[in-house]
């Protein structure tokens, strides 16, 4: 084949790949907005609708009802470009989550004993239940995976709380500044901090193949990275922000470039350490969480693009890995029901018990339990890490996705019932519910 022919073939391949990527992106963005709008219309979070739409675009529905069309859209081109886009979006989203993290909740003195008890019970009980479930169920539902590693990721998925979406649900019910709201958001903040640290440690442990030496080295490198980020990178970034920030709370092009470069370099650093690049994005957000003008400017200029473009890509990426049809036996659905029951009992029951122990009423304790049970996007991030590591099977992945959806869907109806009983929270009218996204600004 001549050089000209090779060049022509290369151009044709590139154009063909671009065609299918653009087709996928058009479908994902449009249907993501439709799914989100439907969810908002019925009084749910926009994130719930986008997650469900992502699953419906995968083999669970689209692939089952129209396999030829599904393969044409999603299997005609190599999956790597869409995978890379989803991971870039996830890194940016993790940066955004880090930016929005409010550490002042961790120092709130009001009802401190209740906060500590609720956070502890809401983390420890579901983690232990998830660990037991994952360990004993692994031979049946993840036979090819490392049994202990699989159990650790299931336990982490059960113990996490979706702080950003929980905060927005609380805003809809106007309870963020009430004593109950302060207790919940503070407990969820502690839960989230420990949850992300736990995920980083478990990821490092799994990648070290449970070698004490390799694991210790990864932890040492991770600690050095965190220290260098806080004591060296943060002061440098603050100087650059002071020099490059725009007028008011605007984000100049130069500062935007610096932030994006810092996010990607941080992701590269955590990858080189031996944990996933998404942790680098989160760490960079945490470094700048107190730069309020930067946070506002980022959310206004870039946050909405991440929400509208990248987030549905990640949900669809998750949906393509989810196959509800793979749960093709009563035994598998039985395991799924048990997982959902343990997840709800562990988080709701643990937080309810801790709240009652702290002297709160039954109604207050129920509201705390249902709010702390919200998982949404945070759990999807955890289980995607576990799936990429090969420590959970597709069936377990599907079960955990369903659990993430159910645990989030039941939050708003539960609050509509229990908050009025304790004289709090005007349930939002369905037609006026503000769209909310996990880790992203309302759009």
Task: Name every feature range the model reports, one short phrase each.
Residues 12-27, 78-95, 145-161, 218-228, ...:
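Structural signature of hydrophobic alpha-helical transmembrane segments
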Residues 1-17:
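Short, strongly hydrophobic alpha-helical membrane anchors
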Residues 34-49, 55, 265-280, 403-404:
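Flexible hinge motifs at transmembrane-helix junctions and intramembrane kinks/re-entrant loops
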Residues 25-37, 55, 59, 63-64, ...:
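Transmembrane alpha-helical segments of multi-pass membrane transport proteins and ion-pumping complexes
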Residues 30-41, 64, 103-173, 318-403, ...:
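Transmembrane alpha-helices that form the ion-translocation and gating core
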Residues 12, 57-114, 242-337:
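Membrane-interface junctions of multi-pass transporters
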Residues 41-44, 78, 109-121, 178-190, ...:
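Membrane-interface segments at loop-to-transmembrane junctions
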Residues 50-62, 117-131, 153, 186-200, ...:
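Small-residue-rich segments of transmembrane alpha-helices in multi-pass membrane proteins
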